[in-house]
């Protein structure tokens, strides 16, 4: 499953989401909307109003959401850690 986290500079919830995903062994791509303004426009058009926005397969959400992160399946090396 492909996971993308849309972030911005100095975003506390973005950093918390990144740390939570890393601690569970997920691989993901990060897109900084401060550097990619078109990404911010696309997210707004999709109804997102807060960062981070996480897109993981058919799931997507905004904000730091440990409950949603826990719904994802970790990679095998994290499950054995």
UniProtKB/Swiss-Prot annotation:
Example of a GO biological process term: cell redox homeostasis
CDD domains assigned to the protein according to its UniProt record, in alphabetical order: NrdH (cd02976)
Domain annotation Glutaredoxin: ranges: 1-81
A molecular function (GO) term: electron transfer activity
Intrachain S-S bonds: 11-14
Domain of life: Bacteria
UniProt xrefs under InterPro entries: GlrX_NrdH, Glutaredoxin, Grx-like_ET, Thioredoxin-like_sf
UniProt KW keywords: Disulfide bond, Electron transport, Redox-active center, Transport
Function: Electron transport system for the ribonucleotide reductase system NrdEF.
Family designation: Belongs to the glutaredoxin family.
NCBIfam families (UniProt xref): GlrX_NrdH, PRK10329.1
Protein name: Glutaredoxin-like protein NrdH
Native species: Salmonella typhimurium (strain LT2 / SGSC1412 / ATCC 700720)
């Amino acid at each position: 499953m492909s996971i993308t986290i849309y972030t911005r500079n100095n975003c506390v919830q973005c950093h918390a989401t990144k740390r939570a995903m890393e601690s569970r062994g997920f691989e993901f791509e990060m897109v900084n909307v401060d550097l990619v303004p078109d990404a911010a426009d696309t997210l707004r058009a999709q109804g997102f109003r807060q960062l981070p926005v996480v897109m993981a397969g058919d799931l997507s959400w905004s904000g730091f959401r440990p409950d949603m992160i826990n719904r994802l399946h970790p990679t095998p090396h994290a499950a054995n850690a």
